[in-house]
């Protein structure tokens, strides 16, 4: 088995999907989890206005609405969380995503004060954060807020990670990577677009340039610029297609060096890092 085949198998990626079937699969997955643990009453997700959170948010709201109808439990709710750092550049996209999702509840937590306070406390301890590390601080502060909300609402934190993100480790460890349940796992980027199109999402929300937008020095830096490959390259790789060897090596390089992000804390029984 080639490394490409191993990666595809590990991430559960498929070359072709039926969007309607995958929508149903994700919704049923979320419902089944909540049914298994009836003390859980909410799904909590940060909404950025980008493709991934818009899709995960819509699937979460659908799952909650169906489960509420089936069980008669009106305590069930989907909580969409706005998590801007100061003013958000693409605020209108975020509002459009909220309008499309129609969440039961919307909360806004501006993380800027918390991030700056943490940065100042570290500075007083003699640690000056780089812009890159500050970006990770933002991602972790956003996740901290979501878990606080989930803790107070008997909730589960929903993740937006998918195969095209997982393969490159393009997420912050214990930030946007630290979630409870990931309904998009297995899908590549273009497949996520297919699901949103099938759900009637406004096109501009899934055709916009993907960006983590974490760094102050490089605002709205496109994911593809940070990775050195395009999402089309990554999707083609995950679909088993043959790529230019340099591109394939770049993707595989990201996969190998970010393996630690796809695992729980390393123990004495783990040896993947020795390879």
Curated annotation (Swiss-Prot):
Mg(2+) binds at residues 52, 165. ATP binds at residues 46-53, 160, 189, 211. Pfam families: NAD_synthase (PF02540). Keywords: ATP-binding, Ligase, Magnesium, Metal-binding, NAD, Nucleotide-binding. Transmembrane segments: none annotated. One of its GO terms (cellular component) is cytoplasm. One of its GO terms (molecular function) is metal ion binding. Pathway: Cofactor biosynthesis; NAD(+) biosynthesis; NAD(+) from deamido-NAD(+) (ammonia route): step 1/1. Belongs to the NAD synthetase family. Homodimer. This is NH(3)-dependent NAD(+) synthetase.
């Amino acid at each position: 088995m080639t490394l490409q085949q191993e990666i595809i198998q590990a991430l559960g990626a498929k070359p072709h999907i039926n969007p309607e079937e995958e929508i149903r699969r994700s919704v049923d997955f979320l419902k089944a989890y909540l049914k298994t643990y009836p003390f859980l009453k909410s799904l909590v997700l940060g909404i950025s206005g980008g493709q991934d959170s818009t899709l995960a948010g819509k699937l979460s709201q659908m799952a909650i609405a169906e489960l509420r109808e089936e069980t008669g439990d009106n305590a069930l709710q989907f909580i969409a969380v706005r998590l801007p750092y100061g003013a958000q550049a693409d605020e209108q996209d975020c509002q459009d995503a909220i309008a499309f999702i129609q969440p039961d509840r919307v909360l806004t937590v501006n993380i800027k004060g918390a991030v700056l306070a943490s940065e100042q406390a570290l500075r007083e301890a003699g640690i000056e954060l780089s812009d890159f590390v500050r970006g990770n601080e933002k991602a972790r502060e956003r996740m901290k807020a979501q878990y606080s909300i989930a803790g107070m609402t008997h909730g589960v934190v929903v993740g937006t990670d998918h195969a095209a993100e997982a393969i490159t480790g393009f997420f912050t460890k214990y930030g946007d990577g630290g979630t409870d349940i990931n309904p998009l796992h297995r899908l590549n980027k273009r497949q996520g677009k297919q699901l949103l199109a099938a759900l009637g999402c406004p096109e501009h929300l899934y055709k916009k340039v993907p960006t983590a937008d974490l760094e102050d020095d490089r605002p709205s830096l496109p994911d593809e610029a940070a990775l050195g490959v395009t999402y089309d390259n990554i999707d083609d790789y995950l679909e088993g297609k043959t790529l230019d060897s340099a591109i394939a090596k770049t993707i595989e390089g990201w996969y190998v060096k970010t393996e630690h992000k796809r695992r729980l804390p390393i123990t004495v029984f783990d040896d993947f890092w020795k390879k």
